[in-house]
A protein has these predicted regions:
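ABC ATPase "signature
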Residues: 252-253
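Conserved ABC ATPase signature
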Residues: 168-172, 176
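Catalytic Walker B motif of ABC-type/P-loop ATPase nucleotide-binding domains
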Residues: 193-196
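Short coil-to-helix segment of the ABC ATPase nucleotide-binding domain corresponding to the Q-loop/switch region
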Residues: 127-135
Length: 289
């Protein structure tokens, strides 16, 4: 059963998807292009995400999903097109009729609005859980230590790890480390969260605890763009699913439409492969028991 959402889902599963929600736009991407050398990896992406919306991006490896997220945070500078987050430009500013790259100070301020979590946890191994979470609020936002600690404890409680604040990353499971990474991002009070395959490096038995934390964020109204291979999660939590292939958005729509009755053959072929792989993994797991 899909989550109850304040956003009204539209049933149109096409690349020209238009949401009927009246919520303000949080992320707007227009005609986004990105190349590595002569290889174009994003080919004119158009995407709008509204405040409080959960958008899941699926597609085969190499389709440009992770690059798209990195461009939204300008970890990967894009070649052309425009991105705005909460009405503010990402990466580039217009000056004297031209386009200039933001200064490092401007980029740091911009990135405070955009949380991003990767499949690698990237925690500082020599710092405790609490120290990992307070580092950016103190060093980047300039918060007082006491204020940063209060925020960190609130976010650790949010992901079910308040009791682990004095532990070191090496003392945590992979799922717990990933939840610390989520709490660390939330401590910066972002406008939008970008989550890039954050369960793919975890053992299967640890995936559920991370998905539960993401579900809680969705229920709390956090705007999220999620790259995932977890189709059940995409169905249950998303307001919209976007299918990408070969650097383009092939189609997008409500999860109960796109995941069960997609319009394009490329989408159908991808979903068939996912189902086949899931069945093989399930049979292998059963054989080991």
């Amino acid at each position: 059963m899909s989550r109850s959402t304040m956003l009204e889902r539209a049933g149109k599963a096409a690349s020209g998807f238009e949401s009927s929600t009246t919520a303000p736009v949080m992320v707007r991407i227009w005609n986004l292009h990105k190349s590595y050398g002569r290889t174009e990896v994003l080919k004119g992406i158009d995407l709008t995400v509204h405040r409080g919306e959960v958008v899941t991006v699926i597609g085969p490896s190499g389709s440009g999903k992770s690059t798209l997220l990195s461009c939204i945070n300008f970890l990967e500078p894009f070649d052309s097109g425009e991105i705005t987050v909460d009405g503010e430009p990402v990466g580039w500013v217009t000056a004297a009729g031209g386009r200039l790259r933001m200064s490092e100070q401007q980029l740091n301020l911009m990135r405070q609005r955009i949380g991003i979590v990767f499949q690698q946890f990237n925690l500082f191994p020599h710092l405790t859980v609490l120290q990992n979470v307070i580092e950016a609020p103190i060093q980047v936002k300039g918060l007082a230590r006491e204020q940063a600690i209060a925020i960190a404890r609130e976010q650790l409680a949010r992901v079910g790890l308040r009791a682990k604040e004095n532990a070191y990353p090496s003392e945590l499971s992979g799922g717990q480390q990933q939840r610390v990474a989520i709490a660390r991002s939330l401590a910066m009070d972002p406008k939008v969260m970008l989550l890039d395959e954050i369960t793919s490096a975890l053992d299967p038995e640890l995936v559920g605890e991370v998905l539960s934390a993401m579900r809680a964020l969705a229920e709390a109204g956090m705007t999220m763009i999620i790259v995932t291979h977890e189709m059940a999660f995409a169905r249950d939590v998303s307001d919209r699913v976007v299918f990408m292939d070969e650097g383009s958005i092939v189609e997008q729509g409500a999860p109960d439409v796109l995941l069960t009755n997609p319009t394009h053959e490329r989408t159908r072929a991808f979903l068939r492969r996912v189902i086949e792989r899931t069945e093989i993994q399930s049979e292998t797991a059963n054989a080991r028991e």
